[in-house]
């Protein structure tokens, strides 16, 4: 797969282009030149990512080649069955979910799903769920509780869809109900931010016993552009807003909002998805084993205490 380079990666793009040119020449005696350029490109990528800012991290989190929910589901789970619809209005394809097995154990999974091409982006509403998407997730949550199945959620959305129709059909109610149900669901819930975690649209499937986050994911109450538009009346201030919001994985972990940060390959998950899947598989198994060692009462008490801990000054 040919990598799409972000604006701040252009120096790496130029070096990689030179490597490709030399490969295309296919001449003897240039192997050392190719190796030298490859080492230089890697060092340049390391230099860039060693001092990545919050706004640059946002761009990595939004990278169009980044693995999406269905990529994780297909890589981590077996016997995957997709369930559709909220049994009330429609099937919102911005949220997908269903049943599967993880290491042979039946589970319920759900997550936001963005599109790869224009047609799919429109079909999935750019990963912005409507109320029926959250009600589909609610249906799956209740199914999980009924059959005592652990839940895995994958978070990757700019936010809930703010359209008039969505508001008319109860967007805020759908999100609020999911928060209430997930806070008291009598099965283990493991949530993972794999890309963007946009406000209530992310939180609606983000209440659980563990919050994992990929190294170059972001999680915030509002997008940097939205914040900049409100505070400075200028979306061009998004970079400053991103730094101010504290949206990166390490910073959120430091505040006690994220339990574990999953390291990504140099340059982001899209450069080596298999490495990310392998790490996720290992950490999912670890956390699930810990949670399943608790009885239901202990599980719910721990979750309640965890939620009440959020926002307490000095708690982290």
UniProtKB/Swiss-Prot annotation:
UniProt cross-references to SUPFAM superfamilies, sorted A to Z: ClpP/crotonase
GO biological process terms, semicolon-separated: fatty acid biosynthetic process; malonyl-CoA biosynthetic process
NCBIfam families: accA, AccA_sub, PRK05724.1
InterPro entries: Acetyl_CoA_COase_a_su, ClpP/crotonase-like_dom_sf, COA_CT_C
Record-stated family: Belongs to the AccA family.
An annotated Gene Ontology molecular function: acetyl-CoA carboxylase activity
Cell compartments where the protein resides: Cytoplasm
The protein's enzyme class: transferase
Pathway: Lipid metabolism; malonyl-CoA biosynthesis; malonyl-CoA from acetyl-CoA: step 1/1
Entry-linked Pfam families: ACCA
This protein's record includes keyword Transferase: yes
Catalytic activity: N(6)-carboxybiotinyl-L-lysyl-[protein] + acetyl-CoA = N(6)-biotinyl-L-lysyl-[protein] + malonyl-CoA
EC number of the protein: 2.1.3.15
Name this protein carries in UniProt: Acetyl-coenzyme A carboxylase carboxyl transferase subunit alpha
Gene: accA
Function: Component of the acetyl coenzyme A carboxylase (ACC) complex. First, biotin carboxylase catalyzes the carboxylation of biotin on its carrier protein (BCCP) and then the CO(2) group is transferred by the carboxyltransferase to acetyl-CoA to form malonyl-CoA.
Gene Ontology cellular-component annotations: acetyl-CoA carboxylase complex
Chain ranges of the CoA carboxyltransferase C-terminal domain: 40-290
Family matches, as PANTHER family: ACETYL-COENZYME A CARBOXYLASE CARBOXYL TRANSFERASE SUBUNIT ALPHA, ACETYL-COENZYME A CARBOXYLASE CARBOXYL TRANSFERASE SUBUNIT ALPHA, CHLOROPLASTIC
Subunit structure: Acetyl-CoA carboxylase is a heterohexamer composed of biotin carboxyl carrier protein (AccB), biotin carboxylase (AccC) and two subunits each of ACCase subunit alpha (AccA) and ACCase subunit beta (AccD).
Highest taxon, organism lineage: Bacteria
Keyword terms of this UniProt record: ATP-binding, Cytoplasm, Fatty acid biosynthesis, Fatty acid metabolism, Lipid biosynthesis, Lipid metabolism, Nucleotide-binding, Transferase
């Amino acid at each position: 797969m040919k990598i799409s380079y972000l604006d701040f990666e252009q120096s790496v793009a130029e070096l990689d282009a030179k490597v490709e040119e030399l490969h295309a020449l296919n001449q003897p005696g240039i192997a050392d030149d190719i190796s030298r350029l490859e080492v230089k490109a890697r060092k340049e990528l390391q230099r860039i990512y060693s001092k990545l800012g919050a706004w640059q991290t946002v761009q990595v989190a939004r990278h169009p080649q980044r693995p999406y929910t269905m990529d994780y589901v297909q890589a981590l789970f077996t016997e995957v069955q997709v369930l559709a619809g909220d049994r009330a209005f429609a099937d919102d394809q911005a949220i997908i979910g269903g049943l599967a097995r993880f290491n042979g154990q039946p589970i319920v999974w759900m997550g936001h799903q963005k599109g790869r091409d224009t047609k799919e982006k429109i079909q999935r509403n750019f990963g912005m769920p409507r109320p029926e998407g959250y009600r589909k997730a609610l249906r799956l949550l209740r199914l999980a509780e009924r059959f005592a199945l652990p839940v895995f959620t994958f978070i990757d959305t700019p936010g809930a869809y703010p359209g008039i129709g969505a508001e008319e059909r109860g967007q805020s109610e759908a999100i609020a109900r999911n928060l209430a149900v997930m806070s008291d669901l009598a099965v283990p819930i493991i949530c993972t931010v794999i890309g963007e975690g946009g406000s209530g649209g992310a939180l609606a499937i983000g209440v659980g016993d563990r919050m994992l986050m990929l190294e170059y994911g972001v999680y915030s109450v509002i997008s940097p552009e939205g914040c900049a538009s409100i505070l400075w009346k200028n979306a061009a201030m998004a970079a400053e807003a991103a730094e101010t919001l504290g949206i990166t994985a390490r910073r959120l972990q430091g505040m006690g909002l994220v339990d574990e940060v999953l390291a990504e390959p140099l340059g982001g998950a899209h450069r080596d998805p298999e490495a990310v899947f392998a790490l996720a598989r290992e950490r999912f198994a670890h956390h699930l084993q810990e949670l399943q060692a608790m009885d239901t009462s202990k599980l719910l008490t721990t979750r309640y205490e965890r939620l009440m801990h959020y926002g307490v000054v000095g708690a982290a």
